[in-house]
């Protein structure tokens, strides 16, 4: 810091500090004089040739504006220097006010939001339930059956449509004899049991044969998204064109090769599936206990969050949702109107995330935690196992500094969880593979 800069601080609250900064007026005067001389070289004033305008005229016409520009520049150049000199952990941009020239000094006040220095409560009172699961043969068989279903085909079937069959049909809906928008379609495909349609629709089609026609009566749910249809009784004329049954692919060499199994047959596929499921269990269990631990801490630690942090988190979550929209609907994220996603939609979750970030940072600072590079290497190696060329993935995360920094951040957060768990009480609970993964998916959707 420049030795001629004077700074005093006044902590207004746990999240805000005010600095009073004094800059010697000579700094201002020297810069003002320099700029006035520069302006004089090109200034045009009636009655004088370019470059020959008297300095008194230049000062009279341009002096006040130049001085204000210089003051703004000096404030911009010194405010962050002042913040740094006081070891202030600022959040967002400072707010400048009360600017004045006083006793040979330029004096101004800078109010800045600061990273809260909280005393974390309840660390030794944490009680969480840690879910665990074991992969059994039935789980593996179910997973392989799901892999087959992902590649199932439908072949024509003679006879009545039953659960699991795919029916191709035309339908025409009406309410009180009047057709309604969206109530008709041709060559519509429906798998019986998929619950894709409103209640009663599938039941009306079940048992029909190709070439059969009939009218079914259904009632739209009271909470149906189209308000003009909600709770209304409707009639649908159904014309079944085709009934098909599911045909799963054989567990032959061609099917096995789809999953990278060239040797070892079905047993090798089962082994690969089991290992992948065990990785999923490890990740899901880790995610569950992390969430439970953080939830327990957040219940005991409510504190104000700097507005800048909250605004940044709201914007981050809004951008994430827009990205999900773009992936789901195939549109560019920039094409979505942000006004459709107001701040209020994200405030609760953003406040939680901001508080959690502060808590994690405080644990790291107060306990002197440093990222475990061995865990980083293990993390990268395990992540790479999910890709066709693990060596290439490892090289990418090892050489790309930003990507490695992201992984280090995740690992350090895991170390925080380990520390917190070590201070509290953890009870293990065995759950099924399906329940553990379903809980993880639900947790991710809520974020």
UniProtKB/Swiss-Prot annotation:
Transmembrane segments: none annotated. One of its GO terms (cellular component) is cytoplasm. GO terms for molecular function: peptidyl-prolyl cis-trans isomerase activity; protein folding chaperone; ribosome binding. Its EC number is 5.2.1.8. This is Trigger factor. It catalyses: [protein]-peptidylproline (omega=180) = [protein]-peptidylproline (omega=0). It comes from Psychrobacter arcticus (strain DSM 17307 / VKM B-2377 / 273-4). Belongs to the FKBP-type PPIase family. Tig subfamily. PANTHER family: TRIGGER FACTOR CHAPERONE AND PEPTIDYL-PROLYL CIS/TRANS ISOMERASE, TRIGGER FACTOR-LIKE PROTEIN TIG, CHLOROPLASTIC. Keywords: Cell cycle, Cell division, Chaperone, Cytoplasm, Isomerase, Rotamase. GO terms for biological process: 'de novo' cotranslational protein folding; cell division; chaperone-mediated protein folding; protein transport; protein unfolding. Involved in protein export. Acts as a chaperone by maintaining the newly synthesized protein in an open conformation. Functions as a peptidyl-prolyl cis-trans isomerase. The gene is tig. Pfam families: FKBP_C, Trigger_C, Trigger_N. Consists of 3 domains; the N-terminus binds the ribosome, the middle domain has PPIase activity, while the C-terminus has intrinsic chaperone activity on its own. InterPro entries: PPIase_dom_sf, PPIase_FKBP_dom, Trig_fac, Trigger_fac_C, Trigger_fac_C_sf, Trigger_fac_ribosome-bd_bac, Trigger_fac_ribosome-bd_sf, Trigger_fact/SurA_dom_sf. It is found in: Cytoplasm.
């Amino acid at each position: 810091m420049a030795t001629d800069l004077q700074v005093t601080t006044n902590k207004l609250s746990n999240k805000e500090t005010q600095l009073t900064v004094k800059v010697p007026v000579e700094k201002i005067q020297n810069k003002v004089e320099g700029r006035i001389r520069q302006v004089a070289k090109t200034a045009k004033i009636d009655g004088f040739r370019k470059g020959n305008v008297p300095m008194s005229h230049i000062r009279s016409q341009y002096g006040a504006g130049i001085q204000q520009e210089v003051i703004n520049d000096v404030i911009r150049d010194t405010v962050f220097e002042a913040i740094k000199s006081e070891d202030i952990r600022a959040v967002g941009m400072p707010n400048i006010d009360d600017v004045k020239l006083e006793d040979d000094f330029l004096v101004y006040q800078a109010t800045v939001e600061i990273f809260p220095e909280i005393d974390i409560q309840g660390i030794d009172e944490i009680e969480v339930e840690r879910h665990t699961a074991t992969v059994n043969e039935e789980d593996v068989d179910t997973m392989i059956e799901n892999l087959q279903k992902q590649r199932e085909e439908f072949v024509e079937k003679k006879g009545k449509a039953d659960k699991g069959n795919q029916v191709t049909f035309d339908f025409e809906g009406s309410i009180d004899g009047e057709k309604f928008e969206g109530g008709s379609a041709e060559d519509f495909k429906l798998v019986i049991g998929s619950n894709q349609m409103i209640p009663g629709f599938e039941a009306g089609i079940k048992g029909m044969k190709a070439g059969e026609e009939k009218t079914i009566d259904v009632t739209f749910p009271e909470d149906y998204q189209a308000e003009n249809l909600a709770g209304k009784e409707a009639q649908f004329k159904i014309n079944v064109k085709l009934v098909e049954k599911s045909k799963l692919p054989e567990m032959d060499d061609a099917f096995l090769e789809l999953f990278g199994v060239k040797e070892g047959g079905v047993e090798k596929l089962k082994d690969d599936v089991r290992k992948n499921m065990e990785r999923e269990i490890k990740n899901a269990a880790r995610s569950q206990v992390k969430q439970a631990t953080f939830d327990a801490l957040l219940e005991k630690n409510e504190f104000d969050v700097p507005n800048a942090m909250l605004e940044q988190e709201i914007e981050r979550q809004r951008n994430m949702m827009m990205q999900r929209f773009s992936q789901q609907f195939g549109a560019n994220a920039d094409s979505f109107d942000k006004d459709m996603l107001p701040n209020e939609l994200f405030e609760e979750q953003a406040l939680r995330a901001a508080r959690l970030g502060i808590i994690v940072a405080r644990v790291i600072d107060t306990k002197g935690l440093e990222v475990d590079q061995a865990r980083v290497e293990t993390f990268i190696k395990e992540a790479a196992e999910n890709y066709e060329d693990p060596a290439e993935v490892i090289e990418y995360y090892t050489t790309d500094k930003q990507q490695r920094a992201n992984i280090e951040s995740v690992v350090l957060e895991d170390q925080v969880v380990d520390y917190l768990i070590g201070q509290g009480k953890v009870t293990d609970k065995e759950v099924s593979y399906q329940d553990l993964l379903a809980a993880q998916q639900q947790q991710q959707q809520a974020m």
